[in-house]
Amino acid sequence: MKRVTGIGGIFLKAQDPKALGAWYEKHLGVDVQDWGGAQFFFKDDESPREQGYTVWSLFKEDTTHFAPSTKPFMVNYRVADLHALLAALRAEGCEVDEKVQDDEYGKFGWVMDPEGNKVELWQPPTGG
């Protein structure tokens, strides 16, 4: 029997859910609904035969990958143009990590949200 077939949702604790939802809507374009969440539908019209993917992974308790956040999680969001988004976030006054990682898995950048959550932004490699 197959059990988990994908990630159905990511849930975050927030000190002020409305304000944090507004931040994600303004700066990252997340369409936050009245019920307090958003739904993402994955379909690639340009390459319908190619399959996109979402990664779920466990890190050791002492990882520094989430730093400077002290939270026990990090959310990764797919983006179309990492460098353009990072530039826009900087212009909007967001706390953007200067480091950008570019490897066979794509391009990665990071921003901190107002509650200290490190947000990973990922531009998949071509065909990913």
Short names for language-model regions:
Residues 45, 57-66:
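A solvent-exposed interaction/effector surface
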